[in-house]
Regions:
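Glycine/serine-rich phosphate-binding loop and adjoining beta1-alpha1 elements at the start
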Residues: 117-232
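Adenosine-phosphate binding glycine-rich loop
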Residues: 2-27, 223, 334-449
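ATP-dependent carboxylate/acyl-activation modules
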Residues: 84-94, 100-127, 186-193
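Structured beta-strand/loop patches that form or line metal/cofactor-binding pockets in enzymes
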Residues: 44-75
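Rossmann-like adenosine-cofactor binding region
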Residues: 267-366, 371
């Protein structure tokens, strides 16, 4: 599979310990494939077993979450927290609440988080958590009881200087609030143990917008430096209609682009006149409705069942912001055929390895998730800083810091790729830049894990 015998041994070890965990194995394979030149140039990595250690979580916590529904019936879900790597700082990563959550998904997300967090330049390690609980269709009371039960166990394993979870799919401001309240109740301390908190109890301005805004700052810098171009006058397709998609749409529009499509798990809407974001926010953030309602309210907009069709829409820039592996090889080929010039990932691993190969072999600019969507965790780390100082920055201050971080992530990835004769391969560059910092810290600390 790899040219390096060492990398093949490492991957075979992962396969033996994690059989059938396809998402995790895919993530490991993608990262290891980028590290061939780094391993060849640095024999200390093999001598000190750095790769064997970095692909194995420092700690995996699986637990039962029992809660009572509105009918008085006891329900049981499984909770997860994978503390993957703390070489450069406390574990940091979101909590995903979705029926698709399993050990493989959480491990893949935690593994990716190591490199994403490293790329921000901030002192945060990699971790991830979640549960197969589905908040959709649940009452506020049911969600509160689930979150309290979940945090009762999770609280034993986290802390402001140990592990700082955040939101993710299914975990928004409401869920973070319920979890924070339960942690405070159990520990009798007010501390920055979670990020994504409300502004009245330690949250940060611009956190809600951060992942979507950061995605566009990264993409704008990529277009500027590699194509001498920008969002201005470009047609943009954004998948998803959650937090990341909404604020990517907002920032892309502010930068001069025209977003013509959004989606959810049922289908997608196409508006050739440009998505009207106020309507989307009303449907998704206020009413918690489905994206098909957009077509019912806006003249000229069309709704189509199924999510995959969104990638058949002609566009200059594609921003997948929905979920993992949403762009497969077939969809990638259609995007290329229709003239896409840049793809940047707002979701975690939304493109399959085959799709990425199509983009790269076709000369399409490709911004990988671990770099392009790092704005959320970067601003979470800025929230941690504000909590430590007992101080709050203004929206513009946080936004300016976010933009600087995203611009630096692009350049660090670009330069790392160039260093190993992989110029233009931002995926390899992001993996290398993120890995080198973590590996150096691991070597300096000895065999601590």
């Amino acid at each position: 599979m790899f040219k390096s015998e060492y990398l093949n041994r490492v991957y075979e070890g992962v396969e033996k310990r994690s059989p059938g965990e396809k998402e995790f194995l895919q993530a490991v394979r993608e990262v290891l494939g980028s590290l061939e030149p780094v391993v060849a140039a640095n024999p200390k990595l093999e001598e000190n077993g750095v790769l064997e250690r970095i692909v194995e979580p420092e700690r995996q916590i699986f637990f039962r979450v029992s809660w009572v529904d509105d009918n008085g019936k006891v329900q049981v879900n499984r909770g997860y927290r994978v503390q993957f790597n703390s070489a450069i700082g406390p574990y940091k990563g979101g909590i995903r609440l979705h029926p698709s959550v399993n050990a493989s998904v959480i491990k893949f997300l935690g593994f990716e988080q190591i490199f994403k967090n490293s790329l921000t330049g901030l002192p945060i390690g990699g971790g991830k958590g979640g549960s197969d609980f589905d908040p959709k269709g649940k009452s506020d009371g049911e969600i509160m009881r689930f979150c309290q039960s979940f945090m009762t166990e999770l609280s034993k394993h986290i802390g402001a200087d140990t592990d700082v979870p955040a939101g993710d799919i299914g975990t928004g401001a409401r869920e973070i609030g319920y979890m924070f309240g339960q942690y405070k109740r159990l520990r009798n301390e007010f501390t920055g143990v979670l990020t994504g908190k409300g502004l009245t109890y330690g949250g940060s301005l611009a956190r809600t917008e951060a992942t979507g805004y950061g995605l566009c700052y990264y993409t704008e810098e990529m277009l500027k430096c590699m194509k001498n171009d920008s969002f201005k006058g470009k047609t943009v397709v954004v998948s998803g209609s959650g937090n990341v998609a909404i604020y990517a749409t907002e920032k892309a529009t502010q930068l001069g682009g025209k977003v013509v499509a959004l989606s959810d798990s049922n289908g997608y809407v196409y508006d050739p006149n440009g998505i009207k974001l106020d309507v989307v926010k009303q449907i998704k953030e206020v009413e918690r409705g489905r994206i098909k309602e957009y077509a019912e309210r806006v003249d000229g907009a069309e709704y189509h069942e199924g999510c995959k069709g969104i990638w058949t829409i002609k566009c200059d820039i594609a921003l997948p912001c929905a979920t993992q592996n949403e762009i497969d090889e077939e969809s990638a080929k259609i995007l290329v055929k229709n003239g896409v010039m840049a793809v940047a990932e707002g979701a975690n691993m939304p493109s399959t390895l085959e799709a990425i190969e199509v983009f790269q072999s076709s000369g399409i600019l490709f911004g990988p998730a671990k770099a392009a969507n790092a704005g959320g965790v970067a601003t979470s780390a800025l929230e941690m800083s504000q909590n430590s100082m007992r101080y709050s920055w203004t929206f513009d201050e946080v936004d300016a810091k976010l933009k600087d971080i995203m611009v630096n992530i692009f350049h660090n990835s670009y330069n790392a790729a160039k260093k190993y004769n992989l110029e233009g391969n931002l995926l390899a560059g992001a993996n290398v830049a993120g890995f080198e910092k973590v590996a150096e810290a691991m070597l300096a600390q000895g065999v601590a894990y």
